[in-house]
Amino acid sequence: MTCGVLFGTISETALSDAIPGSCTIFTASYGNTVLFGNNEDYTNPKTYYWVHPSSDENYGGVYVGFDNFNLQGGINEKGLSFDANALPKARLNPHPELPAPPSEWVVETIMKKAATVEEAIDIAGRYKRDNWGIPFKYQIILADATGDAVVISAGPDGELAFTRKKQGDGYLVSTNFNRANPENAYSYPCWRYNRAVEMLKKIEDENDLTVDYFKSILDSVHGEGASNNTLYSNIFDMRNGIIYLYHWHQYDEVVKLNVAEQIERGFWCQRIADLFSQQTNDKALAEYLGYQGKMIIARKNLAWVWMILVAFSLVVLIWNLARGAQVSWRVRLVWVLVVVLFGPFGLMGYYLSYRQRQRSAAHESALESQGASF
């Protein structure tokens, strides 16, 4: 399959649009089990997975995302995993004194070069911040096969901030508020964050930390709707190199991918939907078309409401002009055109202009009266 720009460098424009909406990402480690879970919430149904093979210089990896093939999440051959949350833009100090970064997104460099969270943090701070994206509108969560994890975001001071998972058994969660600066948020407090934490707290030992339990967390925080929908979910078993994929918040069918086997295939990409049964795809399509139909109806209703408002505004304007407003026909035609284009907002502009004329006329009349009295 041809994957377009899959193996090219990432532009600033692509990077600024790369991180989708209300994703919920979490990782946990207990004993010898380390898992990483993600719900990809967005509007683009064209989802893919693809493979970067290993080389003498780079680790191979399996990645997930959309048809622009910007990395949204993934796992490399060493078990290092990542995903990202969208945030409002934040300031990031450029550090021009540092070496120039590679001509790719910093996370892609990390996934090629790092095996652990410690190595990822070292790479993150090594270069100028050019390849983080301008403006900086996201945070990333990274976890490795040892159980270490970190959320990297912009701190209040404009420096990279590293929110670490506690050492040993435990968990780390990332949604759409900045873990180092909660004021930088799309939603805070975040119900998805609170729900995920509530469920992760119930894990007491390694026997509780299972793929099925992670799946239940993903299900409990998934989204449905025309504006933001859980398009796919993934669970990475980092110790065993296994990917569990779910399509369109349907958690009753799972596809398992072996990371090592996928990397051996070389450069490769495939639609996520093509991995699943016709029944699962039919359900997803029916839901998608249902949302699209509702959006079309809503747009039509909005168009009718707007036309009614424009017509009403035009009637009010013509009535006012006919009452004897002292303006030329040319000015009247201009106001008619303004109201046709801008509806009630144009009418509001007319009234503001009319009031201004009245005030000017009253002021001139007062001055004339004062002059006559002298």
Language-model segment annotations:
Residues 1-7:
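Bacterial N-terminal signal peptides
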